[in-house]
Amino acid sequence: MEKFELKESATTPRILINSKKGKIKLIGTSTLHNPEEFYPKVLNIAQKYFDKPLEETKVTIDLDYYHQNSFNYIFQFIELIVGLEKFKRTKLKMMWHHHPLDQGIAEDIALISKTLDYQIPTMSYELVS
Protein backbone atom coordinates (compact mmCIF):
# COMPACT_ATOMS: atom_id res chain seq x y z
CA MET A 1 0.00 0.00 0.00
CA GLU A 2 1.53 3.30 -1.07
CA LYS A 3 -1.35 5.58 -0.17
CA PHE A 4 -4.66 5.26 1.62
CA GLU A 5 -7.01 8.21 1.72
CA LEU A 6 -10.50 8.49 3.09
CA LYS A 7 -12.30 11.73 2.30
CA GLU A 8 -13.90 13.66 5.14
CA SER A 9 -17.66 13.41 5.56
CA ALA A 10 -20.11 14.92 8.03
CA THR A 11 -19.31 12.16 10.54
CA THR A 12 -15.89 10.81 9.54
CA PRO A 13 -12.51 12.51 9.50
CA ARG A 14 -10.21 12.72 6.52
CA ILE A 15 -7.60 10.04 6.97
CA LEU A 16 -4.43 9.93 4.91
CA ILE A 17 -1.69 7.35 5.23
CA ASN A 18 1.00 7.94 2.61
CA SER A 19 3.55 5.17 3.01
CA LYS A 20 5.78 6.53 0.25
CA LYS A 21 6.15 9.95 1.91
CA GLY A 22 5.80 8.90 5.56
CA LYS A 23 2.77 11.13 6.15
CA ILE A 24 -0.27 10.47 8.28
CA LYS A 25 -3.18 12.91 8.65
CA LEU A 26 -6.32 12.79 10.75
CA ILE A 27 -8.46 15.86 10.07
CA GLY A 28 -12.06 16.88 10.70
CA THR A 29 -14.87 15.44 12.79
CA SER A 30 -15.49 11.95 14.14
CA THR A 31 -19.08 11.44 15.26
CA LEU A 32 -19.83 8.05 13.75
CA HIS A 33 -22.72 6.05 15.19
CA ASN A 34 -20.65 2.86 14.97
CA PRO A 35 -16.95 3.71 15.32
CA GLU A 36 -16.32 0.06 16.20
CA GLU A 37 -17.13 -0.80 12.58
CA PHE A 38 -14.99 2.01 11.11
CA TYR A 39 -11.80 2.42 13.13
CA PRO A 40 -10.61 -1.21 13.32
CA LYS A 41 -10.46 -1.23 9.50
CA VAL A 42 -8.45 2.01 9.54
CA LEU A 43 -6.13 0.63 12.23
CA ASN A 44 -5.55 -2.51 10.13
CA ILE A 45 -4.61 -0.38 7.12
CA ALA A 46 -2.34 1.80 9.27
CA GLN A 47 -0.66 -1.30 10.67
CA LYS A 48 0.75 -2.01 7.20
CA TYR A 49 2.66 1.28 7.40
CA PHE A 50 3.59 0.70 11.05
CA ASP A 51 5.14 -2.65 10.07
CA LYS A 52 7.57 -0.90 7.69
CA PRO A 53 7.71 2.82 8.54
CA LEU A 54 10.00 5.27 6.80
CA GLU A 55 12.95 6.73 8.67
CA GLU A 56 10.83 9.82 9.42
CA THR A 57 7.05 9.96 9.89
CA LYS A 58 5.13 13.24 9.85
CA VAL A 59 1.76 13.17 11.62
CA THR A 60 -0.83 15.96 11.48
CA ILE A 61 -3.91 15.81 13.68
CA ASP A 62 -6.56 18.50 13.36
CA LEU A 63 -9.79 17.19 14.82
CA ASP A 64 -12.36 19.86 15.54
CA TYR A 65 -14.80 17.49 17.23
CA TYR A 66 -15.14 13.84 18.21
CA HIS A 67 -17.25 11.93 20.69
CA GLN A 68 -16.05 9.57 23.42
CA ASN A 69 -16.49 6.37 21.40
CA SER A 70 -14.35 7.79 18.60
CA PHE A 71 -11.81 9.09 21.14
CA ASN A 72 -11.08 5.55 22.29
CA TYR A 73 -10.04 4.58 18.76
CA ILE A 74 -8.19 7.86 18.16
CA PHE A 75 -6.22 7.11 21.33
CA GLN A 76 -5.31 3.64 20.01
CA PHE A 77 -4.23 5.16 16.70
CA ILE A 78 -1.97 7.70 18.44
CA GLU A 79 -0.62 5.03 20.78
CA LEU A 80 0.52 2.99 17.77
CA ILE A 81 2.11 6.04 16.16
CA VAL A 82 3.98 7.04 19.34
CA GLY A 83 5.12 3.44 19.74
CA LEU A 84 6.98 3.72 16.45
CA GLU A 85 9.25 6.38 17.93
CA LYS A 86 9.50 4.82 21.37
CA PHE A 87 10.80 1.63 19.79
CA LYS A 88 13.10 3.68 17.54
CA ARG A 89 11.41 2.52 14.35
CA THR A 90 10.94 6.06 13.00
CA LYS A 91 11.69 9.66 13.88
CA LEU A 92 8.28 11.11 14.66
CA LYS A 93 7.26 14.66 13.78
CA MET A 94 3.76 15.06 15.18
CA MET A 95 1.63 18.19 15.47
CA TRP A 96 -1.89 18.37 16.89
CA HIS A 97 -3.70 21.53 15.78
CA HIS A 98 -6.62 22.81 17.84
CA HIS A 99 -8.61 25.94 18.64
CA PRO A 100 -7.15 27.71 21.72
CA LEU A 101 -10.55 27.87 23.44
CA ASP A 102 -11.32 24.17 23.00
CA GLN A 103 -10.62 22.97 26.52
CA GLY A 104 -11.96 19.48 25.82
CA ILE A 105 -9.44 18.75 23.10
CA ALA A 106 -6.62 20.42 25.08
CA GLU A 107 -7.46 18.18 28.05
CA ASP A 108 -7.56 15.09 25.83
CA ILE A 109 -4.14 15.94 24.38
CA ALA A 110 -2.77 16.35 27.91
CA LEU A 111 -4.34 13.03 28.96
CA ILE A 112 -2.90 11.18 25.97
CA SER A 113 0.52 12.77 26.52
CA LYS A 114 0.53 11.76 30.19
CA THR A 115 -0.81 8.25 29.58
CA LEU A 116 1.70 7.52 26.82
CA ASP A 117 4.54 9.41 28.54
CA TYR A 118 5.06 11.32 25.31
CA GLN A 119 4.61 15.07 24.97
CA ILE A 120 2.42 15.66 21.93
CA PRO A 121 3.34 18.98 20.29
CA THR A 122 0.37 21.28 19.74
CA MET A 123 -0.39 24.36 17.71
CA SER A 124 -3.43 26.46 18.45
CA TYR A 125 -5.17 28.50 15.79
CA GLU A 126 -8.22 30.68 15.41
CA LEU A 127 -10.45 30.57 12.38
CA VAL A 128 -10.75 33.93 10.67
CA SER A 129 -13.88 34.73 8.71
Where are these regions (language model features)?
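Short, well-structured hydrophobic secondary-structure segments
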Residues: T31-E56
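A cross-taxonomic marker for long C-terminal extensions/tails that follow the last structured domain
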Residues: E2, E107, S113-S129
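STAS-typified acidic loop motif
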Residues: E2-P40
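Amphipathic alpha-helical interaction surfaces in cytosolic regulatory modules
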Residues: E37, V42, K58-I112
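Glycine-rich, often proline-containing surface loops adjacent to acidic residues and nearby aromatics
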Residues: K21-K25, E55-T60
